[in-house]
Design a protein with these regions (language model features):
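Membrane-helix interfacial anchor on the cytosolic side
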Residues: 58-60, 64
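Alpha-helical bilayer-embedded segments of polytopic membrane proteins, i.e.
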Residues: 4-25
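Short acidic-hydrophobic, aromatic-tinged amphipathic segments that line or gate anion-handling sites
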Residues: 64, 121-124, 214
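Catalytic core of membrane glycerolipid acyltransferases/transacylases, capturing the structured
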Residues: 25-44, 48, 55-57, 72-128
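Generic preference for hydrophobic
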Residues: 64, 77, 99-100, 206-208
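Glycine-rich helix-loop-beta junction characteristic of Rossmann-like nucleotide cofactor-binding loops
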Residues: 66-70
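Non-catalytic C-terminal accessory region of glycerolipid acyltransferases
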Residues: 3-4, 132-254
Length: 254
C-alpha cells in the first residue's frame, strides 16, 4: 500500500478508537455503581471492540500462542510492554486481572475511576520503598481473591528489539506471592509503535511461555524469566519481519 493509505487507515482507526473509548467510558459509567465483575465485563467488551476495529480498519490481526501455559486461578503475569495496544488487548485473555499501573492514572476522569473500580494496583512512584511495600501488599490481597496480577516489568513502553530495562519490582512480587509466574512475550510495537501515530497491518502475536514455579532463588527466577522473555520476543520480531520483509514497520523501530 502507498504511504497515504497507511496514514488514512491510521487516521480512521484513531478516530474510531478514541470515539468508542470515550463513548463507552461515559455510557458505561453506571457500572461504577455495579458489582466489579460487571465493570470488568465492560472493560473486556471495549478491548474486543478495539482489537476488532484495528483488524477491520488497519488490517492488524491478533494471534495468541501458548494459552495452555496459563494456569487457572491466581498467577503472576510478567509481560513485555511495547505499545499502548498491550494495555487493553491483553485484558480479555485473563479471567479477572489486576494490573499494576502508575497512581497518577486515577485522576483521569472516568478512566481513573474505572481503574479504582477494577481494583487495579496503583503505584506511587515518588517514594520507591513505600511504593514497593504497598504494591506487594495490594498484590497479595488480589491473589487471595483468586485474581491474576499483571505487571509490565520494564515500567514503560520499550521499542521492539531495544535493550531491556527490567525493574526489580516484579521480583519482589515473585518472592512474596508464591504463585506461578507466566512470562508473556509479544511483538505489538512493530504494528502499533510507541509515540507514533501510524498503525500497520500484520499479525500481533502474544506468546504465553511456560510458567516459572514459585520458590526459586531470586537470581534463578530473574534469569529464567528475563531470558525467556527476551528470546521469545526476538523470535517474534524476526518472524514478523521475515513474513513481511517490505512492510513499513521493518524500518520503523530499531
Amino acid at each position: 500500500l502507498p504511504p497515504d493509505a497507511f496514514m488514512l487507515r491510521s487516521l480512521l482507526f484513531a478516530a474510531a478508537f478514541y470515539a468508542i473509548t470515550g463513548l463507552m467510558l461515559v455510557g458505561l459509567s453506571w457500572l461504577l455503581l455495579a458489582p466489579r465483575y460487571w465493570a470488568m465485563a465492560g472493560l473486556k467488551l471495549h478491548a474486543r471492540i478495539a482489537t476488532w476495529l484495528l483488524h477491520v480498519i488497519v488490517g492488524t490481526k491478533m494471534e495468541v500462542r501458548g494459552r495452555e501455559n496459563l494456569p487457572e486461578g491466581p498467577v503472576l503475569v510478567v509481560a513485555k510492554h511495547q505499545s499502548t495496544w498491550d494495555t487493553f488487548a491483553l485484558i480479555p485473555l485473563f479471567d479477572d486481572p489486576a494490573i499494576i499501573l502508575k497512581d497518577e492514572l486515577k485522576w483521569i476522569p472516568f478512566y481513573g475511576w474505572f481503574c479504582v473500580k477494577f481494583e487495579h494496583i496503583l503505584v506511587k512512584r515518588d517514594k520507591a520503598a513505600v511504593a514497593l511495600k504497598a504494591m506487594v501488599a495490594d498484590a497479595k490481597d488480589r491473589v487471595a481473591d483468586g485474581r491474576q496480577v499483571l505487571i509490565f516489568p520494564e515500567g514503560t513502553r520499550t521499542a521492539p528489539g531495544a535493550p531491556p530495562d527490567y525493574k526489580p519490582g516484579y521480583l519482589a512480587l515473585y518472592d512474596a506471592l508464591a504463585v506461578p509466574c507466566v512470562p508473556v512475550a509479544l511483538n505489538s510495537g512493530l504494528f502499533w509503535p510507541r509515540r507514533k501515530f501510524m498503525r500497520y497491518p500484520g499479525t500481533i502475536v502474544v506468546s504465553f511461555l511456560p510458567p516459572v514455579p514459585p520458590g526459586l532463588p531470586r537470581k534463578v527466577a530473574k534469569e529464567r524469566i528475563e531470558s525467556a522473555l527476551e528470546a521469545e520476543s526476538r523470535s517474534l520480531i524476526a518472524e514478523a519481519r521475515m513474513d513481511s520483509p517490505t512492510a513499513p514497520f521493518s524500518n520503523s523501530e530499531k
